Amino acid sequence: MRIFYLLSILPFIGGFTIHSSVSPQPSTFTPLNIYNGTPGGRLNRDLRATLPINELKGNPPSEGCPILNLHRCKNPSMYDKNDNIQMLSNPIQKTRGFLKLIRYKNILPTLLLTTTGGFLQTQSITQLLKSTSFLASSMITVCIMASSMILNDLFDIHVDKINNANRPLVTGEVHPQEAVTYAALLLLFAECLTRYLPQQMQMVANWAIVNIVLYTPLLKRIPLVKNISCATIVAFSLYFAGKSATSSVATSPLLYVAAHTVFFGSLHNELLLDIRDIEGDVKNHIRTVPGLFGKTVAWSLAAIGMVYNVVKISTALSVQYSPAPFVLAMSPIFYHLYQIRRQHYSSAVIKKAVDFTNVPLLLSLLYFCKISIS
C-alpha cells in the first residue's frame, strides 16, 4: 500500500524526464535540457561538430555550451576522454555533487532538531537511542529534507543560474536525471521506514512527503504561503520526532514551545532569503513578498514575527520558568535585523544574519532541554 502511495506522487518528480522521442529538442536551459539534447546526457552527433572550442581549462563556458562547468573539449568532434567524460563519471566527483545537492551541512542541524524533540518528550537520551520509532523518524526527516533540497534545485535551475550559480545542477556536477533518481530513492526509503512509526505518525510522514513534492512546483509560487509551508516543515520535524519517540498520547508543553520557536526562526530566515534573492526571483517571474511589496515589507514581517515569538514564548515560560535566558539567547537576532536595515538590505549582511540565526535557536533549544529535566 505504501509503495502504491509513493508511486502516486512520483509523476510530479518524473515529469522532469518525460519527453517525446520524435519532438524537437528544446534549446533553452531546463531540467530536461542541460545537455541541449537527450535527457540521458549524451550529445547529439550533429551537435558535437558545432561546439565552440575553449583551450583554457577551468574557464566557465560561454553561452550555448551544453555542459556548464567543464572546460571545452580540444577536439570539436568529441570530448576529451581524459578530462570531461572522466570528470562526469568520477565517483568522487559525483559524491561531492550529491552532497552539495542535498545541502549536507543541514543534516547535523536536522538531527539536532529531531533529538531535541525526542528529548523534550522523553527526558532521556538512553530511551531515545533504544527507540526504533525515534531512530526511524530521524532518518525519515533527513531523507525528506534531502529530497526537498533536490526537488527545489530541479525546479529552480533558471533561478539558481542568477542567485546560486555554484549549485551542482547548474555547474553540471549532477545531471537532472541523476537528481530525479536520488530524490525518488530518498522518498522511497523514507516511505519504507514509516512502518516503524506509531500509526498516527505514519500519516504525518506521508503528509510531509506530499508537502515537499508539491512545495516547489505549487506552494513556492504563492507569496508568503511558501514561506509558511517551509517553516512549518522545519518546525514540525521537531514535533514529529518527539511524538514518534514515545507511545504516550500526552505531549510535553515544552515540545510545543520549541516547535513554535523553530517555526518563527525558520520563517524569519525564509523572508530574509527572499530579500537576498529578489533579483533572480523577479527575472524569473517568481512571486515573493519582497518582489511584490518591497524589501521593507518583507523585513518588517520577519521582525514582527520574531518579536511576536519572543513575547509569546516568554509569557508562556514565565508561568513556571525564567524567560530571561531565552530572551538573552534570542536578542542577537534583533541586532542583525537592525544591521540589515542599516546596510540597505545588503546580500552579505543578510547571509551573515541567516547563518547566525542557528546559534540563538540552538541556545534556546538547549535551554528548553535543561528546564525540561529540572
Residue map of PLM features:
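Multi-pass alpha-helical membrane architecture of UbiA-family
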Residues: 19, 29-31, 35-374
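N-terminal chloroplast transit peptides
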Residues: 1-35, 49
